[in-house]
């Protein structure tokens, strides 16, 4: 369950000793979920620090996840790049009165002035079971989605940067391996499933590749049913006919079994809980062969690898030059190979970004191309950026393209 509270600034802000009035709005309430209320705020005199106070109640959870987004147009959009928060924010926040979040507005949004600033404070339950084996919990929360470095020209689809709230979910720590693919596919053959592509892999512990989007979706259903879970994909809007054969734009039961991540889920997971970084790691905004399996070249200033071309460890003269999953260090959420190795299919049709804030976006309702993310062993550093978007026909598969699956809490 989730609840939201709002706060509105009524006067110019971010002057060093500015004062301002405000109006507080009660948040939405849910009988069985968390409640955010009595949201109020004040700028500390002589500073550009802003204290956001609120009350937090919840009938059934010891801890909650709290997120904040900021608008400078009266709440029409929440696109202020606010990420430097401290205090009662993030995971593990206990219910109570007088909770305080401090925003370093001077760092995130220097030398800005507005008469229409509004905060949105959101709380969601932390009552999420431990992650299943081989998966990592991606906690609920907001992040800035898109290219904040302006690495791409306008029109490339990575901007505008916008605030997205994503509910909690589990994600495979590793790209699906050839061994796991074969295990599930072997089971599926006697249970009514049909695949257009067998799925290939350099070795059992390397990522599977060369499956199209439809086969990946059907495989997710087979994995769910093999483990006794309710499948996620169906051929009818009533969600009664499990998708097992053919090529269809499936309907989704979002609270059911294994499925592909949405673009927003994938990017939030890839960022590893950090904000404002180019790659899945947070200690540098550069990439080298010590970080990922990709095709290095000097054409990108953020590619500072001492070795160029294909990764020297995996360039053995036999295509594809994939690496064993988990060879490189994980990101902040414990996910491996979120940059390089193989591209990863996502759920979404390719579409343009909105400037407004969003909650659990799932992309356009139709389209021609499905998105994939993350770069590959054959692609340059440009494609390994967390904001980079690539796409292809859903009937398309190749030696550069694999996937990993996600699972909703409670499954």
Predicted regions and their residues:
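Bacterial N-terminal signal peptides
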Residues: 15-26
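Short, compositionally biased P/S/T/A/G/V-rich stretches that sit at domain boundaries
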Residues: 31-45
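Short, structured beta-strand segments at or near domain termini in extracellular proteins/domains
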Residues: 121-123, 398-411
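Functional-site microenvironments in short loops/helix caps that host divalent-cation chemistry
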Residues: 138, 144, 149, 213-390, ...
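Short glycine/proline/serine/threonine-rich loop/turn segments at secondary-structure transition edges
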Residues: 109-116
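A short glycine-rich, aromatic-capped structural motif
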Residues: 60, 127-192, 209-225, 264, ...
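Extracellular acidic, Ser/Thr/Pro-rich low-complexity tracts
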Residues: 55-60, 72
């Amino acid at each position: 369950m989730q609840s939201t509270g709002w706060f509105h600034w009524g006067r110019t802000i971010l002057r060093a000793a500015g004062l301002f009035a405000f109006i507080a709005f009660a948040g939405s309430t849910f009988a069985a979920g968390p409640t955010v209320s009595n949201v109020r705020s004040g700028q500390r005199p002589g500073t550009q620090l802003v204290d956001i106070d609120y009350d937090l109640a919840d009938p059934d959870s010891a801890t909650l996840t709290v997120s904040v987004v900021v608008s400078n147009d009266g709440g029409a959009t929440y696109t202020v790049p606010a990420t430097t928060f401290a205090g009662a924010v993030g995971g593990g926040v206990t219910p109570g009165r007088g909770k305080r979040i401090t925003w370093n507005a001077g760092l995130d949004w220097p030398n800005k002035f507005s008469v229409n600033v509004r905060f949105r404070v959101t709380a969601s339950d932390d009552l999420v079971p431990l992650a299943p084996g081989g998966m990592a919990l991606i906690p609920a929360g907001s992040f800035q989605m898109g290219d904040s470095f302006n690495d791409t020209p306008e029109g490339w689809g990575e901007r505008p940067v916008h605030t997205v709230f994503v509910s909690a979910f589990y994600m495979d720590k590793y790209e699906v391996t050839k061994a796991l693919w074969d295990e599930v596919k072997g089971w599926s053959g006697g249970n009514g499933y049909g695949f257009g592509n067998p799925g290939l892999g350099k070795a059992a512990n390397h990522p599977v590749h060369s499956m199209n989007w439809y086969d990946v979706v059907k495989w997710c259903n087979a994995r769910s049913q093999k483990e006794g879970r309710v499948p996620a994909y169906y051929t009818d809007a009533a969600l009664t006919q499990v998708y097992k054969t053919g090529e269809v734009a499936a309907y989704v039961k979002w609270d059911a079994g294994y499925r592909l991540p949405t673009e927003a889920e994938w990017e939030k997971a890839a960022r590893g809980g950090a904000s404002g970084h180019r790659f899945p790691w947070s200690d540098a905004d550069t990439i080298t062969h010590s970080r990922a399996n990709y095709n290095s070249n000097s054409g990108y200033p953020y590619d500072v690898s001492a070795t160029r071309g294909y990764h020297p460890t995996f360039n053995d003269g036999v295509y594809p030059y994939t690496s064993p999953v988990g060879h490189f260090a994980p990101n902040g959420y414990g996910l491996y190979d979120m940059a390089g190795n193989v591209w990863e299919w996502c759920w979404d049709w390719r579409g343009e970004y909105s400037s407004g804030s969003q909650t659990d976006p799932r992309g356009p309702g139709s389209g021609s191309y499905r998105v994939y993310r993350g770069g590959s062993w054959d692609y340059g550093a440009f494609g390994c950026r967390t904001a980079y978007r690539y796409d292809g026909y859903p009937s398309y598969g190749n030696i550069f393209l694999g996937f990993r699956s996600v699972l909703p809490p409670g499954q």
